[in-house]
């Protein structure tokens, strides 16, 4: 089966079409802008899978309808998923713009005095606004000389932010969300909304009953040699934590081995269902070998599966991580309890950064006073205003231990193409696998347990659906914090000490939901959230605006908020603008 090609970035150099001197004098400068833009993007960006980003430049500069049509024909044949129009001069606004209604688009108008690039930018954006096809504006803060081919830092930042978000939009389009199971314990995010996926993300939902997973395991629809490899890998790398079950519920060695085997099989089969596996065709399972073209998935688990079979914690933790028995690889996106809306936040974070995502319960707000009362410890530093306990039953990506290191030796989570095997091993070494608590998981399983290192910048996100409004996005930038071991132990044992923990301190602004940490917890829209490495809230905001998903709370600096130019016509308050613009334009793929 032919592999689906990755989306490319189209670069559209536009020019003043007047011959006999004007166009001729601008050809080289205009095309050089296009080449410089392409060089920047190919050097600085990668797809989430790690592949190099490709740019496609129009064969000629575009002066009018004919050349715009020729450019569009080329782009259509090369899977261009987003476009950047560049020019140093006046051109003919509506005659030269990209008219594709669902393709993210930006225009860079060169800030120079010799030719009016800014005038074209304004004219073209006016045409976009009038036609209802929003576009992003890129205009350098400082005037450049006509022969200056450098890209200023502020222009570079906008080009990269637009391109990262645009590639995410293009990469999700046409893919599917694999809903493995149905609604888990009444969790609203697992009431999978097909219209949301189709209208806002351009995706399909593949609904599959959990009996399909059971069938694949029971009928050996998997690569048996790979299973042996996975078991050997687990035997070498898994450290096991204490069994906190009552003796009557503790499993013997043979039973524990069977639970481990099935847990690894679940990971293999869910992966095969998502992306396919040619090895299955070799054993006569051609239909199953194709997979479901899923870029993200969710597994219901509780309770219809977990009351009888091993839970999904081990499978989800391994799939969500950047490594397994096959070595370092791109992490998958698999949402616990089939919380599809948290899965979408995970998908956004992965597409923007190429990193693994940490799925967690937004479990407890600990005030400084409560911690001092319970432990005698007074919080300080990043944690001085209180912390949020992010913890789930063990499905968080093992990268979340933050045993990887950046160029300065700081703890972090890296894009998978930068992770060494040594760093993957360090994450495994920092993780214990604890037998699942019988009262919760009667079928057994193993929960991963790790503690996220402190001082690491994170962005916590969540998508919610509001009846009458549609989807909204929440964003909270902050840091992981490290507590003294005795303090952590006291707090952790008050919940479930066999699960992975991140102590999270959001950045406060003193306003609205970010007045204090309690207000952030109080305004969080659901029981789950996602941690993405870095302070990347601005990228999420740009991506959300492309999809027409308003942001209902964030603590990103206003100077970093970057949305289509037409948003400015929807009022003077930038967050109200976002709601009005998203309502006005409707979902990107209107259905």
UniProtKB/Swiss-Prot annotation:
Domain of life of the source: Bacteria
GO aspect biological process, one term: D-arabinose catabolic process
GO cellular component, one term: cytoplasm
Coiled-coil portions: none
Annotated compartments: Cytoplasm
Pathway note: Carbohydrate degradation; L-fucose degradation; L-lactaldehyde and glycerone phosphate from L-fucose: step 1/3
EC number(s) from the headed UniProt entry: 5.3.1.25
Catalysed reactions listed for this entry: L-fucose = L-fuculose
Similarity annotation: Belongs to the L-fucose isomerase family.
Name by which UniProt lists this protein: L-fucose isomerase
Organism expressing this protein natively: Escherichia coli (strain SE11)
Lineage start: Bacteria, Pseudomonadati, Pseudomonadota, Gammaproteobacteria, Enterobacterales
Gene: fucI
